[in-house]
Amino acid sequence: MKICIISFDYWNYDHHIVKKLQEKGIDASHINMGAYKYKNFGERASNAISKIFLNKNIKHVKRQEYVVNTLKKLGPQDQILVLNPHTLDYQTIKEIKSYTPYLISYLYDNLERFPIEEKLELFNKIYSFEDKDVKKYGFEKITNYNYLSENPIQAEEIENDLFYITSYDKRRIKLLRKLTVRLSALEVRSKIVVVGKQVWKEKLKQLSSSKLFSKYIQLRKTPIYIDEVLDEYKKNKVILDLMRDGQEGLSFRVFEAMAFEKKLITDNPSILNYDFYDPQNILYIANDLELLNESFFDTPYKRIPTELFRKYTLDNWLNKVFGLEQTLNEKKITLYSS
């Protein structure tokens, strides 16, 4: 079986899908749009001029060409999965569809943030982690996945009580300002990192605002590699998870916390409806930061049952999205019949 994954793998999550498929003996490939680079300085300068004067992003066009040209080299696929297809034009997706009888999409952002309504008709199956989009458009519900092993290596020493890394987002920044006051009152040792090109705005605000925010929050323009993030998780008791505006689906932090057996603090109310929710492990704070107290940090993590843990693994996710168990069973029946 040949399966191709097409995505803009910014945080390097999607390559785990390909790796796990290959471990299952499937001929899997990954077309990562984020891997496309300018050929030279002239191409970069040309794109900058085009964006300013023609309102046209040549790099966006080149990425589409990169996807199609790579797919031509790979040839026909049994299944193709496109993650968050807002980065692809209608015609590009239509051409991708010509290479497979079964085109799938997984949306791990809501359609309010990245509208793609006009492209939905091109897909044979669409999965989404957002309940409201599932209800409105008839998508199939699926969560993000735990891509880590069942027994990941833990740190020898815990350095902090709480860790959080996030891309720059106005809503999150607003909540973090309130949160730093509470963390300070509780004397919680924490490391919070905000990443993005827009962090300069916060750096300007810090010149005239409370020093408490700058004491607790690190602002940086360049991203932190996922391996570094995972190392930080190991060295902390609790992982913080704050939603984007309009988000209901569970972020990867939830499943990373599950894998490392770390407690979780979140403002996402949908987590209360999941079968793995346990108030000893997960603190839902909503708008009431008074719920954040020392006892949550002091009590140990309560290990969830193995069967429940495996329900949210990448292995189980792949079986559902690509129908792998059904395919393998059909192969067994064919071999038995012959």
Predicted regions and their residues:
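Nucleotide-sugar donor-binding catalytic core of glycosyltransferases
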Residues: K2-E23, D27-F53, K62, N84-T87, ...
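Short N-terminal targeting/anchoring amphipathic segment
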Residues: I5-I6, N69-T87, I104
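A short, well-structured beta->alpha microelement
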Residues: K56-L71
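Short amphipathic alpha-helix with an adjacent loop that forms part of the alpha/beta core around
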Residues: V68-L74, I153-Q154, L291-T299
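Active-site proximal beta-strand in glycosyltransferases
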Residues: L81-N84, I96-N110, Y127
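A short helix->loop->beta-strand "cap" motif at the edges of active sites that frequently abuts
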Residues: Y99-Y102, F123-N124, F260-K262
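Pol beta-like nucleotidyltransferase catalytic core
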Residues: A259, K263-S338
